[in-house]
From Swiss-Prot:
It comes from Macaca fascicularis (Crab-eating macaque). Its main location: membrane. GO terms for cellular component: membrane. This is Serine-rich single-pass membrane protein 1. Keywords: Membrane, Transmembrane, Transmembrane helix. Residues 97-112, 132-142, 231-244 have a biased composition (Polar residues). The chain crosses the membrane at residues 35-55. It comes from the Eukaryota.
Amino acid sequence: MGDLFSLFWEVDPPPIPLNCAIPNQDYECRKDDSCGTIGNFLLWYFVIVFVLMFFSRASVWMSEDKKDEGSGTSTSVRKASKETSYKWQSKDGAWDPSQTMKKPKQNQLTPVTNSEVALVNAYLEQRRARRQSQFNEVNQNQHDSDTTECGSEESNSEASSWKESESEHHPSPDSIKRRKMAQRQRNLGSYQMSERHCLHCKAMRTNEWLVHHSQQKASVTPPMKGDSPEESSISDINTKFSKF
């Protein structure tokens, strides 16, 4: 243990008497090889720690280099854009530093304003579509109400015409009585006319027969004195029939 501590700290060895012989340290180290193993372990330990630190630092350096390259490209792009803007301004006219200071802000706000304009346009289109749909619904409701009114009027007219036709097909009892009375009167008149015609024809025929028969008798037999009442009766009959 004394040898191990002597590697890290300097320990004053105890005084050696003059009579004692000094042992050989190389022989003891060869006999007990713990010094070499500890030294090798410490050596490899420091080597491994150094390698790990190197790799960690190398990764950090690489990431920083990439960031620097990206920032360099962005700065180069910015410089190029500025140069182009300067060129355009120099072509257009005099250069104004206030305009160059304001332009980056305007460039940053342009996409926001464009999106806002798009949103406002979309909102207005939605409102227009809603109003158009409401207007169409109102027109449709008015058209439906007009059609229902027309349909109700047509149905009422049809119902009234149907009632009139029913009243015509199904007359009232008063009209039936009137029709029967008129028909009876017509029948009586036609019967009376037919009877009158028949009596007149009979009278004419009898008159003709009597006249013809009397002429035949007159031609066959001359008239006698005693026959005067018969002739007078025949003449009376003829006069009566002629009057009738």
